[in-house]
From Swiss-Prot:
Domain of life (superkingdom): Bacteria
Any single GO CC term annotated in Swiss-Prot or TrEMBL for this entry: phosphopyruvate hydratase complex
HAMAP family named among the record's database cross-references: Enolase
GO BP terms in the entry: glycolytic process
Protein name: Enolase
Metabolic or biological pathway, per its Swiss-Prot or TrEMBL entry: Carbohydrate degradation; glycolysis; pyruvate from D-glyceraldehyde 3-phosphate: step 4/5
Keyword Lyase: yes
SMART domains per the UniProt record, alphabetical: Enolase_C (SM01192), Enolase_N (SM01193)
Amino acid sequence: MSTIIDVYAREVLDSRGNPTVEVEVYTESGAFGRAIVPSGASTGEHEAVELRDGDKSRYLGKGVMNAVNNVNEAIAPEIVGFDVTDQAGIDRAMIELDGTPNKGKLGANAILGVSMAVAHAAADFVGLPLYRYLGGFNAKQLPTPMMNIINGGSHADNNVDFQEFMILPVGAPTFKESIRMGAEVFHALKAVLHDKGLNTAVGDEGGFAPNLGSNREALEVIIEAIEKAGYKAGENVFLGMDVASSEFYNKETGKYDLAGEGRTGLTSAEMVDFYEELCKDFPIISIEDGLDENDWDGHKLLTERLGDKVQLVGDDLFVTNTQKLAEGIEKGISNSILIKVNQIGTLTETFEAIEMAKRAGYTAVVSHRSGETEDATIADIAVATNAGQIKTGSMSRTDRIAKYNQLLRIEDELGEIAVYDGIKSFYNIKR
C-alpha cells in the first residue's frame, strides 16, 4: 500500500496553444504520476463537461484555472489518504464529489487529470509499465493504427466536408511495420499533393489540409499515394473516414449540407446512399459518425445497409458513455465505439465502456483528441485493454508521434508475445 500525500494541478498548453490541465500525484512511498488532459475541437453535445474559465482577458476565455483550482482545492483534500492503487475507489469518490451527471461542477478535465495521474503513480509504485499495471499479464495486443493523413472539416481551414480521411495498414505483420507503411504513404501523399500544386501544410492532427474539390477527391489522392508508396489499396492498406457529420448537419432543416460537394439539404437516406456509393468505389473499412449524433434513425439505416461489411464507429453518437452505448447495442445501431478518455472523465468509466463494447461484439477504437500533448497515456490504454485499434493522428507533429513511439517501445518490450492483428482486429465485419 502507498498512500497519496499530495495532488497538484497546473495550467499548461495543448498542441493548439490552448490551456489544459496537468496533474501530479505524490505518494508516501515516493511513487509519482503525472498526466495531461487532451481537448477536442468537434465535440459531442452529450460529452462530459470540459470546464473553461470564460474570462476573455485570458487565453480568449479558454483558460482552465477553475478546473486547476478544483483539483487543488476540492479534489486533492478528498483523495489524499487513499491507497494509490485504489483506482475505482478514487474515481468513484471524485464522481460523487462532483455530483452531476456530466461532471459539470468540477469539470471532466479536472477529474480526468487526477484519474490518469493516479494510474501513473500506482504503476510507478508497483514497478510496472502502465499498460501492464492496467491490463495485467494478458496485455499484449498492439493496436491497428488509423492514421489521419488528410484533415478537413473543423480540423482544417479548407473546403473538405469530412473531418478525417485515414489509412489503415492492416496488411503489416507487426505494429512496427504498420508504422513504416503509414509513414511511407504519408510521404508519398505529400509528393502527390505537391505535384498537383496543392498545399502541403498540415492540420490539427498532422494530416495534410489541401483545398480539394470534393470528399471523393480526397479518397482518390490517398489511393494514388498508397500505390506510389508501393502498396495495394484494399489489400495492404484500407481507408477510413471520420465524417463528423454533426458539424455540417443543419438542425433547422434536419438535413445535411455538403458544401464541398455542392450538395445541400440531403436527407439521412441520401447520406447513406452516398456512403454506400463511396464504399463501392473505394476500399473503405471504417466510417465514423456518418450521421448526426441525434439522428438515431439515420444511424439505424446506415447499420442495416453497411454494418455487415464496414466498421461503423460511434463517437459523438456514444461519447464513451455506457448508457449511450447500451442504448445503441439494444437498438442495433453501429458496430463500434470510439473511446476518448475525456468524453467520460475517468479511467474506470473508460474501461467499463470498452468492456461493454467487447461483450456486445462491438469493436473499440482508443482515440486521441485534436488538442493533444506529449502525454501518451492512451497508447498504454490501447494495449492494456487489447482494444485492437487506435486513432492518434498522422505521421507528423510530436503530439501525435509521441503515442506511436510509446507503442513502438511497448512492442519492443513485449518481444515475441506481442500481437498485431491487422485486418483481424475488425472481427465483426466480413472482409
